[in-house]
Amino acid sequence: NNCGHQLPKDARLMTPEAKVKKKVVAILKEHDAYFFYPVTGGYGRSGVPDIVVCHNGRFIGIECKSGKKRPTPLQQVNLDQIAETGGIALVVNEENISDVQDVLNR
């Protein structure tokens, strides 16, 4: 799975959020999930989750945060819409990254 967006390989140069994304991507690859990073500028859409996933026929939107940071109001609207239409919406940080594993194991 090459999602078209490469994160820096040197962890010292990575932001805390980028480190969370890297861990999420590793879990997604372990599960052979289809995923990509949506484009948010230009023709893209603002507020969409950081990573869009399809796994075993399920649509999953993953918003990655660091520490106690929460989704912006627009990000939360998008996450709510995903959940309301039958998808799975996750907000993950360093503390709950195992939630991704749990969802993929279901």
Predicted feature residues:
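Catalytic phosphate/metal-binding cores of nucleic-acid and nucleotide-processing enzymes, i.e., regions
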Residues: 1-106
